[in-house]
């Protein structure tokens, strides 16, 4: 199976976790796009969705799936999204698609976070994939200097503005032994909106696409 076929398999497998009559949190990226395609097949069974990006919102609306503002709802039972890396503790690096802040907000609200990914995203130690950090534009240089002090090599992601109007620094050269500690440290930097480490709030279930089928890992 190709990588895209593995992504499609986990996107459809995530439908098993959708409860009829509920609002579903939807992530961003190529794997989440397959979940949106799958969700369209049961769109009349759900109340609607909450979206983590303008890109996902456009795809959902193209299928005629209702999209709610997160502020309009009191609770969210499920959030489904991909990951750039996921370790054995269900902690992740996310934000390759620059939607990390809205993704993290929805993950915080949701009762259950289902991570969908192909097997290439599984790692023992996070950090081979550059760690995205969303930053207020005027703080870019300051935050970059502080990230160097933490052992990283930050690189400004050119020509990318987030849906929130901010910029992204991608941090290389990190071997993230203590993800929660690093998440806390980077989030504490003035000018940082959020970091793409999903460690304090990781996934509850991971659906991993493999050549032998979809593997389910539970926290």
UniProtKB/Swiss-Prot annotation:
It catalyses: aldehydo-D-ribose 5-phosphate = D-ribulose 5-phosphate. Keywords: Isomerase. Pathway: Carbohydrate degradation; pentose phosphate pathway; D-ribose 5-phosphate from D-ribulose 5-phosphate (non-oxidative stage): step 1/1. It comes from Erwinia tasmaniensis (strain DSM 17950 / CFBP 7177 / CIP 109463 / NCPPB 4357 / Et1/99). This is Ribose-5-phosphate isomerase A. Homodimer. The keyword Isomerase applies. The lineage of its organism: Bacteria, Pseudomonadati, Pseudomonadota, Gammaproteobacteria, Enterobacterales. It holds the Pfam family Rib_5-P_isom_A. The gene is rpiA. One of its GO terms (cellular component) is cytosol.
């Amino acid at each position: 199976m190709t990588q895209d076929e593995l992504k499609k398999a986990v996107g459809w497998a995530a439908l098993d976790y959708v409860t009829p009559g509920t609002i579903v949190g939807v992530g961003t990226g190529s794997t989440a796009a397959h979940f949106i395609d799958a969700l369209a097949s049961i769109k009349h069974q759900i109340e609607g969705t909450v979206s983590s990006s303008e890109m996902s919102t456009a795809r959902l609306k193209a299928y005629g799936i209702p999209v709610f503002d997160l502020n309009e709802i009191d609770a969210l039972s499920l959030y489904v999204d991909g990951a750039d890396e996921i370790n054995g503790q269900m902690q992740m690096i996310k934000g390759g698609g620059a939607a990390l802040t809205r993704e993290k907000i929805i993950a915080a609200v949701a009762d259950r976070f289902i991570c969908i990914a192909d097997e290439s995203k599984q790692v023992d130690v996070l950090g081979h994939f550059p760690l995205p950090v969303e930053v207020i534009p005027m703080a870019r240089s300051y935050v970059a200097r502080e990230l160097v002090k933490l052992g990283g090599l930050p690189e400004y992601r050119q020509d990318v503005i987030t849906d929130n109007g901010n910029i992204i620094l991608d941090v290389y050269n990190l071997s993230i032994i203590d993800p929660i500690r690093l998440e806390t440290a980077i989030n504490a930097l003035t000018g940082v909106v959020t970091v793409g480490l999903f460690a304090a709030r990781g996934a509850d279930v991971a659906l991993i696409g493999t050549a032998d089928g979809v593997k389910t890992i539970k926290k």
